Amino acid sequence: MPHTTSKGKNVYSVDLMFAYINIFTPKATKINLNDINYDMDAKGWGEGNISVNDVLKNPKKYKDDYDRINNANLKYPIIMDTKGNIFDGVHRYIKLKLLNKKTTKAYIFDDKLLNKFIVNKTGDYNTKLEINEYIELFYKKFIK
């Protein structure tokens, strides 16, 4: 299943972000966790109706999400924009906060680069692309 995230009406392909990172090997930057802009009360987990704080307050009720936080592999950098918004790595971020860590590594993408990962501008993150469409999209945005 394709891995996407959304900000406003823009839906971004996290899979394309991983491909970009693996092919072009940008440097990860050490950042202060306080520079990350994440609302722990924002609804968006599960079916979009629970928050991180809901999960942390009710770990038995939200066992799957709670386990994902605890099992998050901290060796992978977070992917974020220049404003501190996370595009991939929320579970890692939450785990780092719970461990009282102060810093982590992050790939920081500016708006120009992030625009290349947009796969939908209608806010419909259920729209699926076929594998050939992802390959063509990557080629058009990064190779041509």
Question: What are the roles of these predicted feature ranges?
Answer:
Residues 1-52:
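Glycine-rich short-loop/terminal segments
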Residues 34-87:
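Short alpha-helix boundary/capping and kink motifs at helix termini
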